[in-house]
Structure formats: C-alpha cells, structure tokens
C-alpha cells in the first residue's frame, strides 16, 4: 500500500500533466544574418506544411522553419 506522501505526490503530478498546455510555445532569440530576432517556436515543421501562412494566421509578421537541435521547427517572427 502506498503511503499518503506518495499519493499526494502522484495526485500533484497528475494535475500538472492535465493542466499543462498541450503545446508549449517557447520564445528564443536566434541570430540570422548578424541580426538578432525573437522567434516563437510553434512546433515541428511536419505539423505545419506552410509555416509562414500559419504564423500570419496567428497574427505574427511571418515565419520560417529553422533547424533547432536535430529537428526542423516552425518558428514565428516575434519582433
């Protein structure tokens, strides 16, 4: 039988998993052509066939796929 401390921890862990947003947007600064720009990472490019169109629909000036780590990520221009 689990102790009450373990049960409280498991309940807390389940609540965090349920309340966490399904897609977390990360804001990162990337240097492109010696200019610093802020980007919002939307997710894998495979999920967004037209990254630029998706970003414009989200009210950003535009977007592009950038290689972040080993994956190509759809990033929207923040500023």
From Swiss-Prot:
The keyword Signal applies. GO terms for cellular component: extracellular region. Disulfide bonds join 45-65, 51-74, 55-76. GO terms for biological process: defense response to fungus; killing of cells of another organism. It is found in: Secreted. The keyword Signal applies. InterPro entries: Scorpion_toxin-like_sf (IPR036574). Its main location: secreted. Keywords: Antimicrobial, Disulfide bond, Fungicide, Plant defense, Secreted, Signal. It comes from the Eukaryota. Residues 1-26 form the signal peptide. Belongs to the DEFL family. This is Putative defensin-like protein 29. It comes from Arabidopsis thaliana.
């Amino acid at each position: 039988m689990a102790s009450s401390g373990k049960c409280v921890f498991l309940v807390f862990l389940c609540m965090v998993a349920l309340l966490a947003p399904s897609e977390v947007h990360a804001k990162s600064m990337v240097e492109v052509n010696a200019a610093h720009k802020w980007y919002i990472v939307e997710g894998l490019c495979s999920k967004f066939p037209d990254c630029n169109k998706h970003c414009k629909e989200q009210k950003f000036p535009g977007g592009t796929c950038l290689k972040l780590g080993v994956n190509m990520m759809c990033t929207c221009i923040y500023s």
